[in-house]
Regions:
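Amphipathic alpha-helical polymerization modules
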Residues: 1-238
Length: 238
């Protein structure tokens, strides 16, 4: 009985984590650059034959697939080509050398003249930040060129991500163990951004399915407990 309860509990815990992830997807369906994450499962079997197999969550993975695009008309909004990510500075000595990557292309210039994306300083293809004068007029070219008053001062830093990728918030990504970021020149579309890569409808369908699996695991736990209680009662009678 104990094995059955353990296996069922592992399944319920895994589905609970999945539901939390789906809820995050649902909340960020319209968040530019958001990337969904999913628990990674392994199959758990009780030693006793005849018991069902249940999944157990052992980690999480990031879904890098491209989301739907939305037209904004803002000339500083950029949509990198599929599979490309903008480079931004997170700190001077943090994880991955203080560099993270995002598809949140809502570029803006703060009060100090720093070009930012996802709230972080944007990096050029040379790994430098972009600092603008108060009267500078910035435009973005189709290949990511940074044009100030018509003169190119650099190019948006873009990379492709491979291997294990971890999230730092809704839209910031860094290579995990065995992962890497490779510099990659690419085109950008201006006046548009990418939304979350799981639609609200997809998330609601996923939630219904995960909830059913969670309920099934909880019912199995209840059934095993009742069987254990009955066995104890029979032992007392004898």
């Amino acid at each position: 009985m104990a094995d059955g309860i353990y296996v069922s509990m592992a399944g319920a815990t895994a589905r609970e984590r999945q539901l939390e992830s789906i809820a995050d997807d649902l909340a960020n369906a319209q968040t530019p650059g958001f990337k969904s994450s999913r628990p990674v499962f392994k199959t758990v079997l009780a030693e006793q034959s005849g018991l069902r197999a249940f999944p157990a969550a052992v980690g999480s993975g990031t879904d890098l697939r491209t989301g739907a695009s939305a037209h904004t008309g803002n000339p500083l909004d950029v949509l990198p080509e599929d599979g490309h990510f903008l480079a931004v500075r997170t700190s001077n000595n943090g994880v991955n050398g203080g560099v993270a990557y995002t598809r949140d292309g809502r570029l803006s210039v703060d009060a100090q003249g720093t070009l930012r994306a996802a709230g972080r300083p944007v990096l050029t293809s040379d790994g430098q930040g972009v600092q603008l004068a108060p009267d500078a007029k910035l435009a973005i070219g189709g290949n990511g060129e940074l044009l100030v008053n018509g003169t190119q001062i650099g190019r948006l830093g873009q990379v492709k991500l491979e291997g294990m990728i971890t999230k730092q918030g809704p839209s910031l990504l860094v290579p995990g163990q065995g992962g890497k970021a490779t510099e990659a020149a690419g085109r950008v579309q201006t006046g548009a951004v990418e939304l979350g890569n799981r639609t609200a409808l997809d998330s609601m369908v996923d939630m219904v399915s995960a909830q059913r699996h969670f309920d099934a695991s909880m019912q199995a736990i209840d059934a095993y407990r009742k069987m254990g209680d009955r066995s104890s009662e029979l032992g007392k009678v004898r």
